[in-house]
Amino acid sequence: MGYHKKDCTPNRKKRYAQGDHEYGCYPDDHYDIHKEKKISRTVADFSYFNQAGSVVLTSTSTDPSVEEIIGLVKFKEVFNGDLISLGGSSTVTVGNISPKAITFRIHKVTTPQYNPLLSPTIYVHTVSVNANMTFSVPLEFVDVFIDDEAEVNYYYTVSIPTGVEATATVSSSTHTGNLYR
């Protein structure tokens, strides 16, 4: 009758330590199973800010592009492999002098900056518009992390292009975010 060697493969390395004897591994008494990353995804907490009221975009034919922040979703402690699902919608009312298009963006900020609009853009959605129209714009995006971050902020913005004389009002904006770990 022989002994069966216990499995010490890398995925079990934390739970078991290599023994000094020929029979394999023994349980590691200092290992906390509750700290082990779970395979199933769960929703984590997040902080949410939505711009109060409405945003009015107004430009002249000599102005550069006008971009305004309409929402912010913030997460603390994001880890490798985490999945973030962002969503939301905004109602847009275009004035009688309209831009040809309105662009919605999501900017991702992992380190605090003075101007979040200078951070990388991870989502762009452009909508063609006509004068005196009202419509709703849905926003959906999924982000997967490959590095750990102490904090990540997602800024939702809306803009009209350069060199256009236009007015538009963005209201009833709702933005949500779910982090799955």
Where are these regions (language model features)?
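Extracellular jelly-roll beta-sandwich "head" domains, especially the C-terminal globular C1q domain
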Residues: 2-181
